[in-house]
Amino acid sequence: MKTPRPYLEHILQECEFLIERVKGISFEDFVKDPVLTRAFVRSLEIIGEAVKNLPKEFREKHSKVPWKEIAGMRDKLIHEYFGVNYRIIWETILKEIPELEKQVKEILQKEK
């Protein structure tokens, strides 16, 4: 079975990046900056890909984390790139990523 720790660490790194980079900017600033929009989308893709690599048993053990939804967002970003809704990206980063960061930190502490 694959060890989940490296994938969790990737998720945590991307969450930390997103949380730090979103500070002090508005949605309007975000959508006007192609480097930032690409970076944020890429971070969400990495999070989703890392989730997909977590063993099923592990995801089931930690079922409070919305693994399926995270992986689904990754699929949508990868396969429908030209239809990306930046408002959804923005809201996800503001509302969901801090909670995911917290959950992953807790899991990493428990799984030492």
From Swiss-Prot:
GO terms for molecular function: nucleotide binding; RNA nuclease activity. GO terms for cellular component: toxin-antitoxin complex. Gene3D superfamilies: bsu32300-like (1.20.120.580). Modified by cognate antitoxin TTE0751; probably at least 2 successive AMPylation events occur on Tyr-81. It comes from the Bacteria. It holds the Pfam family HepT-like. Disulfide bonds: none annotated. The active site is at 74, 79. Its EC number is 3.1.-.-. A motif (RX(4)HXY motif) lies at residues 74-81. The keyword Protein transport does not apply. It is an enzyme of class 3 (hydrolase). The modification O-di-AMP-tyrosine is found at residue 81. Keywords: Hydrolase, Nuclease, Nucleotide-binding, Phosphoprotein, Toxin-antitoxin system. InterPro entries: HepT-like, HepT-like_sf, HepT_RNase_toxin. Homodimer, probably forms a complex with cognate antitoxin TTE0751. Probable toxic component of a putative type VII toxin-antitoxin (TA) system, probably an RNase. Probably neutralized by cognate antitoxin TTE0751. Neutralization may be due to AMPylation by TTE0751. Belongs to the HepT RNase toxin family. This is Putative RNase TTE0752.
